[in-house]
Amino acid sequence: MIPNRSGRLACSGQLTCSGIRRVRILGLAALACWLPLLGCGRSGDRADRSGTGVTRLAVIPKGTSHEFWKSVHYGAVQAADEIGDVEIIWRGPVVESDTGSQIEVVKNMITRGVDGIILAPNQKGGLVDAVDEAITEGIPVVIFDSGLDEGPEIVSYVATDNYRGGQMAAEQMARAIGEKGEVILLRYLPGSESTEQREEGFLAGLSEYPEITVVSSDQYAGDNATSAKEKVDQLLQIHGDSLAGIFAVCEPNANGTLEALRNAGLTGQVKLIAFDPSDALIEALRDGDCSGIVLQDPVQMGYQSVKTMMAALNGEPTEPFVSTGEYVATPENMDEPRIRELLQPKLKD
C-alpha cells in the first residue's frame, strides 16, 4: 500500500486493485498504531484457547441470506483448509439490518473464547462497543467488507475500495446514457459504511459529467428486493417519463430495481447499473436489461481475512488495509474468464 498525492492509500497492483483513491474505515489515521498491537500480545505462537490444537475463528457477516456472504464463507473455509487446524465458526444475522442480533453474535463469540473474530459490521457505529469488548478480552479483530467507526485497534481492514467502485458505476452509467440525462441513486441503509462509500463515489463520479442530473439521491431501499421494488415503483411514478438511469448500490436493491423496471416496461429505456451480481442480474446483463454490474471478489475477501488473522496470531506482519479489488462487468466483457468467475463466484453450501 502506498499513499497517493491526496494522502489516501493507493494500491500498486493492477489485477487486485484498480487504484485506491479513497479508503474509509474512519479510523484510518490510526492505522500506524495497529501493527505493534497485532496478535494482542500473542507474538510468535498461534492462539489456541480451546486447548485442542485447533485455532477457532468466528467469521461474522452482515447477514446470511444473500449469495455474496456464501462466497465469503467459501473463501474463509478455503483459507482455513490450506492452513490446517483452523476451524471457521460462521454465524450472523439472517437479515443485514439486524444490528442487535449481530452484536449478540459477537458477544457470544467472546463468551466462547474464540481465538479471533472476523467481522463485517452492518452498522459502522453500532458494533464499536462490541469490538472494543473483544479486544479488551484479548481477542484480535479483523474487519472486512464494511468499515467501522474510529476507536477499536483492529488488526486489519479487508475490503473492496467501495468509493472507487461507486466512481466506476458512475463512469459506466455515463457511457450507457451517452453522458447526459436524469438518473437516480438508490441508497441502501443509513450507517452501512460500504454502501455509503459507493454512494459518495457515484455522486463524485457523476460530477464530471455536467449534462447528467441526479434527480433523486435521498431514498433508501432497505435490505431486500421487495422493499427496493416498492421504492423504485414510487420513484418511477415521479420520474419515469424522463429517467435515463438508476444505480442500485447492492444486490437486493438491484434485484428489486430490475423487477420494477420490467413491470413498468422500462428495461432498456432506463439503464440499470448494479453493484454485486445475482442470477437475475447476470441474465439481464446478457439480455441488455442491465448495462453494467460493479463486481467485488467475495471469495478473496473471506480468504484474505482468514490469512490476515492467522498471520497476526502467529506474530507475522500484516497490512492495515487489504484490497480485494473492484471490476465492472458489461454485456461486452461478461464472458471473459476473470469477469465470468466474479459474476458467479463459488458458494459455501
Outline where the language-model segments fall.
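Bacterial N-terminal signal peptides that target proteins for export
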Residues: 2-27
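Short, isolated positions within intrinsically disordered regulatory regions of eukaryotic proteins
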Residues: 11, 21, 35-38, 44, ...
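Short linear sequence elements within intrinsically disordered, low-complexity coil regions
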Residues: 16, 22-23, 31, 73, ...
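Bacterial N-terminal signal peptides
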Residues: 26-37
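A residue-level marker of the well-folded mature domains of exported/periplasmic proteins
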Residues: 40-349
